[in-house]
Amino acid sequence: MSDVVNIVVWSKKGCSYCEEVKNYLNEKGFPFQNIDVSEKEKLRDILQVKYGVRHVPVVEIGRGNQYQGITEIGIEHLDLALANHAQIKEAKR
């Protein structure tokens, strides 16, 4: 399994919390892929199926085909998930 952690941010234009999440990831030096769901109901449908939510931001963190979705609002939830993934990486070394 790859040690590379992939981060995907589901966001939309005009979402201040989405910008806060992206700024936080940039400040911490985490590269991420952004998926803009603005006016794209099919993308929101995917979030509904995967996580039971249609709101953004949703942040996915994972490796390979195993991802954790962070749907809770608050940087503390994202920070905890990032820390957990760092611990997993350290434990595998």
Curated annotation (Swiss-Prot):
Pathway noted in the entry: Amino-acid metabolism
Reactions it catalyzes: N-acetyl-S-hydroxy-L-cysteine + AH2 = N-acetyl-L-cysteine + A + H2O
Keyword Transport: yes
EC number: 1.8.4.-
GO MF assignments: electron transfer activity; oxidoreductase activity
Record-level GO BP terms: cell redox homeostasis
PROSITE patterns assigned to the protein according to its UniProt record, in alphabetical order: GLUTAREDOXIN_2 (PS51354)
CDD domains given in the database record: NrdH
InterPro entries on file: Glutaredoxin, Grx-like_ET, Thioredoxin-like_sf
The entry's keywords: Disulfide bond, Electron transport, Oxidoreductase, Redox-active center, Transport
Keyword Transport: yes
Glutaredoxin domain residues: 1-93
Bridged cysteine pairs (disulfide): C15-C18
Family named by the database record: Belongs to the glutaredoxin family.
Protein's job: Involved in a cysteine salvage pathway from S-alkylcysteine. Catalyzes the reduction of N-acetyl-S-hydroxy-L-cysteine (N-acetyl-L-cysteine sulfenic acid) to N-acetyl-L-cysteine. This pathway is likely important in the catabolism of alkylated cysteine generated by proteolysis of alkylated glutathione formed in the detoxification of a wide range of electrophiles.
PANTHER family documented for this protein: GLUTAREDOXIN (PTHR34386), GLUTAREDOXIN-LIKE PROTEIN NRDH (PTHR34386:SF1)
Protein name (database record): N-acetyl-S-hydroxy-L-cysteine reductase
Higher taxonomy: Bacteria, Bacillati, Bacillota, Bacilli, Bacillales
